[in-house]
A protein has these predicted regions:
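Cys/His-rich finger/ribbon microdomains and the adjacent scaffold used
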Residues: 113-262
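Low-complexity, intrinsically disordered regions enriched in charged/polar residues
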Residues: 4-5, 9, 173, 177
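Mg2+/Mn2+-dependent nuclease catalytic core
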Residues: 6, 11-159
Length: 262
């Protein structure tokens, strides 16, 4: 219904295409031009940083910002197709942006960081406390001088969706699948309540589905499930020293894991 308006801004806009659902941080609609803006708590220097890898003879995205690029690329993939289904007779143009802090700009407001303070509830949840005059101060800053601004990643997103970057051939990144096949397979697995296939490696040691030592025994642990299936043992019950416990900048943990040394 909101999309029938000529110009409108929508926060947390939801789009559904087949089995894929996304919530876009900010949708800016100007006629038939849709600006898709994903806000990230990350700083970026356009004078020094690049969205693409600086390695010679390779066409790949910068690994430091790759998760963010694939996040917004997936959102664009869903939004473009959802709009075609919802408005078959309309022709929308979708542009993708990452909203980040620009390290090349100097703040024009003293104490800008004090306008938004991170607080913690008694339950341990974090929230942002906004100063009463924050909006007045922030909106008074000219667009050309704002520290937080949108960076155009539209072309990079299109190339990601088209499978043009080298990392999509990496078995450890997307199991060697191109973007479209990967997201379709992941959506199918999710709808069928099926655990997606994966390759174990040092990335597992920071797994977000890893149970903490003090958690209940009844809680599921995705990290242990994968290692039981792929390596044949439970890391929590293993008494021998594990690769994950080794410290050192130059220890090639993935090399050992590929050699079945865990």
């Amino acid at each position: 219904e909101l999309f029938h308006q000529e110009n409108i801004n929508i926060a947390e806009a939801a789009f559904l295409y087949e089995n894929m659902l996304v919530r876009v941080d900010i949708i800016e609609k100007k006629g038939n031009v849709i600006n898709l803006i994903e806000v990230k708590a990350k700083s970026w220097n356009p004078l020094e940083d690049s969205f693409l890898s600086k390695q010679k003879n390779t066409s790949a995205t910068n690994s430091d910002i790759r998760p963010y690029l694939y996040d917004v690329a997936f959102q664009k993939y869903v939004v473009v197709r959802a709009l075609k289904e919802m408005f078959p007779h309309e022709q929308f143009t979708v542009h993708a942006y990452l909203m980040m802090a620009d390290k090349s700009r100097t703040a024009t407001v003293n104490g800008l960081n004090q306008l938004f303070k991170v607080k913690t509830t008694p339950e341990g949840r974090s929230y942002i406390e906004t100063a009463p005059n924050a909006m007045e101060i922030v909106t008074s800053i000219p667009l050309s001088k704002r520290v937080v601004r949108p960076f155009d990643v539209d072309e990079v997103c299109d190339n990601i969706i088209d499978g043009q970057y080298a990392e999509q051939q990496d078995q450890e990144f997307m199991i060697g699948r191109c973007f479209k096949k990967h997201v379709e397979q992941m959506a199918t697995d999710y709808c069928n309540n099926k655990k997606s296939d994966c390759i174990i490696g040092s990335k597992c040691f920071s797994c977000q589905f890893r149970k903490k030592p003090n958690d209940s025994d009844k809680m599921l642990d995705g990290y242990c499930e994968c290692w039981k299936e792929k390596a044949g043992f439970d890391p929590f019950k293993e008494k021998r020293a594990l690769i994950q416990d080794l410290n050192g900048q130059y220890i090639r943990k993935d090399m050992y894991i590929k050699g079945l040394k865990y």
